């Protein structure tokens, strides 16, 4: 009788082990491995240049100069959003434009141009280079920090580029005040170092 009970116990243990192995195999077949993320996807690349990092109080290091972000303009055209950051630290008015267009992060270093006598046209020549109109439109804007603009309003723009895309122009009209011209050049993220802005009042991590 004792030997019979031992045999029954061994059989039960073997059946239990077989059941565990089969369940583990089924779980392995049904499980979906975690997918790896594209390191150059817009949400990955843009995080260092997004509104959480770039804003009033942030530092942008470029060409051996540390520029302080004095103010930020957030622009909305339908569902499309982009930012313009006023920089203090160099000669003249410098702006850093940031947008994600069709999944690609685009950064532009803009310089305000005065005394040029230019107005929007199909082609605009500046610095002996021909710029052709690339796009135009209108947007709503809101401001944070010091920008020289009202807290919110409307603007129009007409953007230009050279054939090789190395030189850009932008005419902007803020609330009907007249066209202002800026010249720009595309930047790569690796050319700049961003030291994040302090948290805004009421945001997580803010300290009075």
Regions found by a protein language model. Give the residues of each.
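Mixed-charge, low-complexity intrinsically disordered regions
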Residues: 1-84, 88-208
